[in-house]
Amino acid sequence: MITVFVACLFQCVSSLPAKLYIKTTLAERIGKLQTVIGIDNDIVFAYERLYEDLTLLNHTVVGETLFDLTGSLEEGKNSTVDRFLGHVVIREFHRLHAGLQYVSLRNFSVSELVCFVNNNTQLSGSYVFLAGNTTYVQIDLFNENRGFVHDLINLSSFLQNRSLHVLSFYARRFCVEDILNFYGKVVFGDSRHRPPQVFSKRDTGLLVCTARRYRPIGTNIQWSIQNQTVSDDHMTDDFIRTEIAGQLLYSYERALSRALSMTQRNFSCEITHKLLVTPALLTREDAFSFKGFVNPVKQSEDMFPRHNFPAPHRKKFNKLQLLWIFTVIPIAAGCMFVYMLTRYILFFVSGGCSLNPNRVLKRRRRNDEVPMVIMEVEYCNYEADDYMELHSVQKVRDNSIAVVCGNNSFDIERQSKISRNF
């Protein structure tokens, strides 16, 4: 089993963050390919197929996907959401129609999901890819008839039943959220909850309303206090440059003056775009319901088997690492604790004595008043003639030395007794 994991953290450019995961597994011997696409740990698409012609595996790079976070507002486009499903869907199409001469992986290197707002302020989305190196095929994701601009390739046999509803789900969810970031009246007052478009700068305390990661062409932010428009004299503008995947984007911020930010309470922030004449037609419900697919996530779970899909940003430990973490390290720490505890118990039970003379010396120098013990061991054995241990040498206050007992001291004391007897 050869397993290839391709994982990418997809941060949506609107106020809706999303994590996009793609997991592709290839069983080479049986020719089984499984592709699972998930968002925020929910499976929205799982495709599994057995291939009789194993020679197709030699012409396919499994797990290679293209993620390119881009944004654009020129020429009527409100945003290019992402190039996230291009390789997955098209590679599946290539496997199903491998006998066609005009189908090749190289021909489908250009693909993107685009959101538009037409002159009637209606939201529309298309999936565009390049076929045959010269022809662009555009699929209308918001049209239930799903007409194609060019009928060179009949994609309905595959896309309509397998992947088209997934593409439509992504388009409607992200495109709507993306465009709504240019039209949203954010009202807040005494409530502690503050919407993500509004924040306070820590250094200055200014109240800021922002439209993040967009080109500022046609974008407008207007502050209001108690339904009264704030003049431009009390606001400051700021553009922040951000480069994502080679695409230069901006964040447009408009901050209230410090006096208004600190004294007023009832604020409202309105983000608009010049292309949206009647933006009320765009509602957030469009992101989760559309014709033919009431609940695309639920339908995907019913149509395709659900698989365990771990988040790729979480670190996975192998069995050896888990053995060290939960077995070896705790046992070693426990043994060290028992060893140290045993040493301390033996030390205090023995009356504070230690085999190290330096410790005894320091302790006795602090505690003894008259004699200062330099070294001591066991009690003296005066009865033994052949063996005598060195026991203690004491220094008295008058600088005289009292020899208690020991091999040398016993000899000295013994010699003195002999001399006195004579």
Swiss-Prot record:
TM annotation in the entry: 322-342
Free-text function comment from the UniProt entry: Plays a role in the down-regulation of the host stress-induced NKG2D ligand UBPL1, which enables immune cells expressing the NKG2D receptor to recognize and annihilate infected cells prior to viral spread.
Superkingdom of the source species: Viruses
Membrane topology listed for this record: Single-pass membrane protein
Residues of the signal peptide: 1-15
Chain positions carrying an annotated carbohydrate: 58, 78, 107, 119, 133, 154, 161, 227, 266, 407
Keywords of the record: Glycoprotein, Host endoplasmic reticulum, Host lysosome, Host membrane, Host-virus interaction, Inhibition of host innate immune response by virus, Membrane, Signal, Transmembrane, Transmembrane helix, Viral immunoevasion
Gene Ontology cellular-component terms listed: host cell endoplasmic reticulum membrane; host cell lysosomal membrane; membrane
Predominant localisation class: host cell
Protein name: Glycoprotein U20
InterPro entries, alphabetized: Ig-like_dom_sf (IPR036179), Ig-like_fold (IPR013783)
Localization terms from the record: Host endoplasmic reticulum membrane; Host lysosome membrane
GO BP: symbiont-mediated suppression of host innate immune response
Paired cysteines (S-S): none
